[in-house]
Swiss-Prot record:
Keywords (A to Z) from UniProt: Cell membrane, Membrane, Receptor, Transducer, Transmembrane, Transmembrane helix
Gene Ontology CC: axon; dendrite; membrane; neuronal cell body; plasma membrane
Family of this protein: Belongs to the insect chemoreceptor superfamily. Gustatory receptor (GR) family. Gr22e subfamily.
InterPro entries with a match to the protein in the record: 7TM_chemorcpt
This protein's name: Putative gustatory receptor 36a
Short name of one Pfam family: 7tm_7
A molecular function GO annotation: taste receptor activity
Purpose of the protein: Probable gustatory receptor which mediates acceptance or avoidance behavior, depending on its substrates.
GO biological process: monoatomic ion transmembrane transport; sensory perception of taste; signal transduction
Organism of origin: Drosophila melanogaster (Fruit fly)
Name of encoding gene: Gr36a
Length: 391
């Protein structure tokens, strides 16, 4: 059967190399990460080219009317902040990949080893991977279409600026997609662990009803204890992957979340400006407006996918804790070693709760996400009020 999921993952890998985000090579057959000289030199060449393009853009005057045919001063400030933050996010992602290259290589190798251990995990996540891939592709094509729409207003400086802006967007989107795929992989493994825990508890429940106890009973208890210990070991590995992911993507995470925040406020303000002034007042064509709002839709769809997969992982972790609590319903005591194995994995989950943190500044939860949305709404209102008063 054709492995289209594996093909998509390899396309993402090579795309990451082409845009300069991945600076190592992967041996897919052996599940190894290789620091090949060819990959290093290619990444250096791409990164140097990016820096040259950015320096060329900074040294030249850029006409902000390529975004709106007629923009007031507040529009220009908003655009400058958005573009500057995107450039800073892209550069920080590239620099961080070199600074934490060894740690990232260990993380990828750890993920690949578990991935090859149970290849059907890939099939469990196939539709989520396809949706994320499709949203990313459509988003990139829409951004290219928006750039093509403004070709008649582009000089050389503006063309370089739009090209570098697109390149930085591609790097940021790819970094976010990599984070998404790792979390998705961990969540798929959690589904397997929950199934195994349920089976072990069910078999233990059946054993607890057996009396008198014989040698076969003790053998079965030892077998179940080994299974629980293996589950605990694998859960610890998965949590270690999430911890390493927090460390590797820390700086990128704060830049991306800052970008989502600023971009959401700016999007609300621009939508207000278009609703009040009309697209003709801003010298924006109907097709350009349709492309922009279509891109907004896919941009936020991607953000929602990223958020939901993290929140669902928290739910899976909590559900695993709840499943383990069912062992207290056994009708009689089990073997001491099996009881200790159950207690050990429960203590492991309680003592080391799952967290997805952004640079140790805040933890991603439903409450923190709701607070961020509330803050976005508040600051969007402030920006609109400022526009109403002074422009």
């Amino acid at each position: 059967m054709f492995d289209w999921v594996g093909l998509l993952l390899k396309v993402l890998y090579y795309y990451g190399q082409i845009i300069g985000l991945i600076n190592f090579e992967i041996d897919w057959q052996r599940g190894r990460v290789v620091a090949a000289q060819r990959g290093i030199l290619f990444a250096i060449a791409i990164n140097v080219l990016i820096c040259m393009v950015l320096l060329l853009q900074i040294s030249k005057k850029f006409n902000l009317d390529v975004y709106f045919g007629r923009a007031n001063q507040l529009h220009q400030y908003v655009i400058i902040v958005m573009v500057s933050l995107r450039m800073a996010s892209g550069i920080s992602a590239i620099l961080n990949r070199w600074r934490q290259r060894a740690q990232l290589m260990r993380l990828v190798e750890c993920v690949l080893r578990l991935f090859l251990k149970k290849p059907h995990v890939k099939q469990m996540s196939r539709w989520a991977i396809l949706v994320k891939f499709s949203v990313g592709v459509v988003s990139n094509f829409l951004q290219m279409a928006i750039s093509m729409e403004s070709l008649d207003r582009l000089g050389f400086n503006e063309f370089v600026g739009m090209a570098s802006d697109f390149w930085m967007s591609a790097i940021i989107n790819m970094a976010i997609s990599q984070h998404y795929l790792v979390i998705l992989f961990v969540r798929a493994y959690y589904h397997l662990l929950k199934t195994e825990v349920r089976q072990a508890i069910h078999e233990s429940q059946m054993l607890s009803e057996i009396y008198p106890r014989r040698a076969a009973f003790m053998t079965k208890c030892c077998y179940l204890a080994d299974r629980i210990d293996n589950i605990a070991k694998l859960q610890n590995q998965l949590q270690s992957i999430v911890t390493q992911l927090n460390q590797v993507f820390g700086i990128q995470g704060i830049m991306v979340y800052g970008g989502y925040y600023i971009f959401s406020v700016a999007t609300t303000y621009i939508t207000y400006s278009l609703a009040i002034n009309g697209i003709e007042e801003l010298h924006l064509s109907v097709r350009a407006a349709a492309l922009v709002f279509s891109w907004f839709l896919f941009y936020y769809t991607s953000a929602i996918l990223n958020l939901f997969v993290m929140l669902k992982l928290f739910d899976d972790h909590k559900e695993m804790e709840r499943i383990l609590e069912e062992r207290t319903l056994f009708t009689s005591a089990l073997d001491v070693r099996l009881e200790q194995s159950f207690e050990s994995i429960q203590l492991q989950l309680i003592r080391n709760p799952l967290k997805i943190e952004v640079l140790d500044i805040f933890t991603i939860t439903r409450s923190s996400s709701a607070a961020m949305i509330g803050s976005i709404i508040t600051n969007s209102i402030f920006l609109i009020q400022y526009d109403m008063e002074y422009f």
